[in-house]
Protein backbone atom coordinates (compact mmCIF):
# COMPACT_ATOMS: atom_id res chain seq x y z
CA UNK A 1 0.00 0.00 0.00
CA UNK A 2 1.28 3.46 -0.83
CA UNK A 3 -0.06 6.92 -0.33
CA UNK A 4 0.70 9.84 -2.60
CA UNK A 5 -0.31 13.38 -1.79
CA UNK A 6 -0.07 16.04 -4.46
CA UNK A 7 -0.31 19.64 -3.42
CA UNK A 8 -0.68 22.19 -6.19
CA UNK A 9 -0.52 25.53 -4.45
CA UNK A 10 0.57 28.28 -6.84
CA UNK A 11 2.03 30.41 -4.05
CA UNK A 12 4.24 27.57 -2.76
CA UNK A 13 5.28 26.55 -6.27
CA UNK A 14 6.19 30.17 -7.06
CA UNK A 15 8.22 30.44 -3.86
CA UNK A 16 10.01 27.15 -4.58
CA UNK A 17 10.75 28.26 -8.15
CA UNK A 18 12.16 31.52 -6.80
CA UNK A 19 14.31 29.64 -4.28
CA UNK A 20 15.62 27.37 -7.02
CA UNK A 21 16.48 30.30 -9.29
CA UNK A 22 18.36 32.04 -6.47
CA UNK A 23 20.36 28.89 -5.82
CA UNK A 24 21.40 28.68 -9.48
CA UNK A 25 23.34 31.96 -9.26
CA UNK A 26 25.22 32.43 -6.01
CA UNK A 27 27.11 35.48 -7.30
CA UNK A 28 25.00 38.17 -5.57
CA UNK A 29 25.18 36.38 -2.21
CA UNK A 30 28.90 35.69 -2.59
CA UNK A 31 29.53 39.36 -3.40
CA UNK A 32 27.67 40.44 -0.27
CA UNK A 33 29.67 37.91 1.76
CA UNK A 34 32.88 39.20 0.18
CA UNK A 35 32.09 42.79 1.15
CA UNK A 36 31.25 41.76 4.72
CA UNK A 37 34.32 39.56 5.17
CA UNK A 38 36.68 42.06 3.54
CA UNK A 39 35.54 44.75 5.96
CA UNK A 40 35.82 42.38 8.92
CA UNK A 41 39.34 41.34 7.88
CA UNK A 42 40.44 44.97 7.59
CA UNK A 43 39.01 45.70 11.04
CA UNK A 44 41.24 42.99 12.53
CA UNK A 45 44.23 45.18 11.76
CA UNK A 46 42.82 47.94 13.98
CA UNK A 47 42.27 45.42 16.79
CA UNK A 48 45.55 43.52 16.17
CA UNK A 49 43.76 40.21 16.59
CA UNK A 50 43.11 36.92 14.79
CA UNK A 51 39.67 35.77 13.65
CA UNK A 52 39.50 33.77 16.90
CA UNK A 53 39.99 36.99 18.89
CA UNK A 54 43.54 36.11 19.98
CA UNK A 55 45.88 39.10 20.19
CA UNK A 56 48.70 39.15 17.65
CA UNK A 57 52.23 38.77 18.95
CA UNK A 58 53.76 42.18 19.64
CA UNK A 59 56.54 43.49 17.44
CA UNK A 60 60.07 42.71 18.57
CA UNK A 61 62.21 45.51 20.06
CA UNK A 62 64.31 45.52 16.86
CA UNK A 63 61.21 45.97 14.69
CA UNK A 64 59.88 48.69 16.99
CA UNK A 65 63.15 50.60 16.69
CA UNK A 66 62.91 50.49 12.88
CA UNK A 67 59.31 51.57 12.37
CA UNK A 68 56.74 54.10 13.46
CA UNK A 69 53.96 52.81 15.68
CA UNK A 70 53.68 49.71 17.81
CA UNK A 71 50.86 47.76 16.16
CA UNK A 72 51.88 44.50 14.48
CA UNK A 73 51.21 44.35 10.72
CA UNK A 74 50.54 48.09 10.58
CA UNK A 75 53.45 49.47 8.61
CA UNK A 76 53.80 53.03 7.47
CA UNK A 77 52.17 52.29 4.10
CA UNK A 78 49.34 50.16 5.57
CA UNK A 79 49.36 48.28 2.25
CA UNK A 80 48.72 44.81 3.66
CA UNK A 81 45.50 45.99 5.30
CA UNK A 82 44.49 48.34 2.49
CA UNK A 83 44.94 45.76 -0.25
CA UNK A 84 42.73 43.06 1.27
CA UNK A 85 40.25 42.27 -1.49
CA UNK A 86 37.85 39.60 -2.65
CA UNK A 87 36.81 38.10 -5.94
CA UNK A 88 33.86 35.98 -6.97
CA UNK A 89 34.37 33.60 -9.86
CA UNK A 90 32.79 30.29 -10.87
CA UNK A 91 30.74 30.07 -7.68
CA UNK A 92 33.72 30.68 -5.38
CA UNK A 93 34.55 33.54 -3.05
CA UNK A 94 38.24 34.26 -2.54
CA UNK A 95 39.55 36.75 0.03
CA UNK A 96 43.18 37.68 0.40
CA UNK A 97 46.00 40.07 -0.31
CA UNK A 98 48.25 40.40 -3.36
CA UNK A 99 51.17 41.41 -1.14
CA UNK A 100 53.99 38.87 -1.41
CA UNK A 101 54.62 38.95 2.35
CA UNK A 102 50.97 38.33 3.32
CA UNK A 103 51.47 34.57 3.81
CA UNK A 104 54.49 35.12 6.07
CA UNK A 105 52.52 37.58 8.19
CA UNK A 106 49.57 35.18 8.38
CA UNK A 107 51.45 31.91 8.98
CA UNK A 108 54.76 33.18 10.36
CA UNK A 109 58.26 32.12 9.31
CA UNK A 110 61.44 31.02 11.04
CA UNK A 111 64.82 32.70 10.60
CA UNK A 112 66.37 31.60 7.30
CA UNK A 113 63.30 29.61 6.21
CA UNK A 114 63.55 31.05 2.69
CA UNK A 115 67.30 30.75 2.27
CA UNK A 116 69.82 33.57 2.10
CA UNK A 117 70.20 36.79 0.15
CA UNK A 118 73.21 37.90 -1.94
CA UNK A 119 75.06 39.01 1.19
CA UNK A 120 74.54 35.58 2.76
CA UNK A 121 72.06 36.94 5.31
CA UNK A 122 69.10 34.71 6.27
CA UNK A 123 65.67 35.38 4.83
CA UNK A 124 63.90 36.35 6.97
CA UNK A 125 66.61 37.73 9.22
CA UNK A 126 64.66 36.80 12.36
CA UNK A 127 61.72 34.70 13.46
CA UNK A 128 58.36 36.14 12.47
CA UNK A 129 55.44 34.96 14.61
CA UNK A 130 52.17 34.04 12.93
CA UNK A 131 49.64 36.83 13.02
CA UNK A 132 46.53 35.34 11.38
CA UNK A 133 44.29 37.93 9.78
CA UNK A 134 42.30 35.77 7.32
CA UNK A 135 39.48 33.50 8.42
CA UNK A 136 36.02 33.69 9.91
CA UNK A 137 35.22 34.81 13.42
CA UNK A 138 32.06 33.64 15.16
CA UNK A 139 30.47 36.98 14.23
CA UNK A 140 31.58 36.52 10.61
CA UNK A 141 29.89 33.11 10.54
CA UNK A 142 26.65 34.59 11.87
CA UNK A 143 26.80 37.41 9.31
CA UNK A 144 27.41 34.97 6.44
CA UNK A 145 24.43 32.88 7.54
CA UNK A 146 22.31 36.04 7.69
CA UNK A 147 23.38 36.95 4.15
CA UNK A 148 22.49 33.47 2.90
CA UNK A 149 19.08 33.62 4.58
CA UNK A 150 18.47 37.09 3.18
CA UNK A 151 19.28 35.96 -0.36
CA UNK A 152 17.03 32.92 0.04
CA UNK A 153 14.25 35.14 1.33
CA UNK A 154 14.03 33.34 4.66
List the model feature ranges, each with a label.
Residues 1-154:
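Short, Lys/Arg-rich flexible segments
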